[in-house]
């Protein structure tokens, strides 16, 4: 067996990506402080044909060299929009019948492995700040809370790992 070269991977170019049918998922970043994490989210969103990313609050926006370092050009392919207030984004998404899901540890959260998607339903996954998590007001406004099960000594995963 041999490793494939990049030229053999049959990937989409930026125009093909923009024109392609997307996965019915939107990512909402609620006050993410690390530019490297933001870039990693863009790269993951590109890999999974995610429809759009909302960058909210203090979350930095492209172009920025530290975002570009981990995004590797995905800021050109993945649609994104900045919004000052995450709650405003949630309200807009709900009006479009998109189910809002905060990824957080909270009362009555559903474990990720127990969550079942429904056909023809679109989802917005909300990821929070590296220290404080998803803000309480956003958790309260979300339709569902999903918790990623963890069994070690740490209380959380890095956001770029959680998004993946």
What are these regions (language model features)?
Residues 1-164:
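Post-transcriptional modification and biogenesis factors for structured RNAs
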């Amino acid at each position: 067996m041999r490793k494939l070269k990049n030229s053999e991977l049959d990937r989409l170019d930026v125009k093909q990506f923009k024109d392609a049918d997307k996965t019915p998922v939107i990512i909402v970043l609620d006050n993410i402080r690390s530019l490297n994490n933001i870039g990693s989210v863009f790269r993951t969103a590109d890999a999974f044909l995610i429809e759009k990313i909302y960058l909210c609050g203090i979350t930095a926006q492209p172009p920025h060299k530290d975002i570009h370092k981990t995004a590797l050009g995905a800021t050109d392919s993945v649609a994104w929009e900045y919004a000052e207030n995450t709650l405003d984004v949630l309200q807009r998404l709900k009006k479009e019948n998109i189910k809002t899901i905060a990824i957080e540890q909270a009362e009555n959260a559903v474990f990720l492995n127990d969550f079942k998607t429904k056909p023809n339903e679109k989802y917005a996954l909300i990821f929070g700040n590296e220290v404080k998590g998803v803000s309480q007001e956003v958790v309260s406004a979300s339709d569902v809370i999903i918790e990623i099960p963890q069994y070690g000594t740490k209380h959380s995963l890095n956001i770029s790992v959680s998004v993946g």
